[in-house]
Amino acid sequence: MNEAEELLGIHLTELGLPFERQYPYAKGRRLRADFALLDSWLLIEITGGVYHGGAHGSVEGVLRDIDRLNAATLNLWRVLRFTPDQVKDGTAIATISRTLGAFALEEQARGAREPTT
């Protein structure tokens, strides 16, 4: 686990959000997300390789990331991706909080539209 992952784990814990680390999200594939908020079907990835000359910045790395995002979407997950700097400056946890609030509003709206008997 790197520094940004450790910090995001602290932020999620401070907000009282239960999460899983290195969560396998696609059956039959060896794909894992850095964090999963299971109750919200939200995966969180911290992409640091671009900044450190890692695989994410290569053509092959970009194609792998596209495949991973598509696999998550096909398995009904929503995905947020952040850089280590966004975790450190608070952008990531603020975005996660806003996203979870939007999910709650969406659920309320769906409930209001469902027919009653």
Residue positions per predicted region:
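Nucleic-acid endo/exonuclease domains
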Residues: 1-117
